[in-house]
Amino acid sequence: MALLEEQQIAEGLERLEGWEWDRENNAIRRTVEMPDFMSGIHLVASIARAAEEADHHPDMDIRYNRITFHQSTHSAGGVTVQDMELAARIDELVADAVPAG
């Protein structure tokens, strides 16, 4: 799997919601704040199902109602198209899980 170039990563991030490039870890990341712990856990479960379907898995750090997603392709050593695709799917699931208002 081919790594994305800097420009490709920057362009991909423009299409995503709240993601940033973590250059130090050669990954993209997003932190989401949910209303409470259980809604965060439900979100993590829905993302886990999507990750299994895609056979591509984000690193997830859960701190009460805050979840940080780190996305990279470990076997490739950085960010690939697969990472951008899963990040877009995570965005969809977050939008579905976060109450409007």
Regions picked out by a protein language model, each given a short descriptive name:
Residues 1-101:
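Long, contiguous binding/interaction regions
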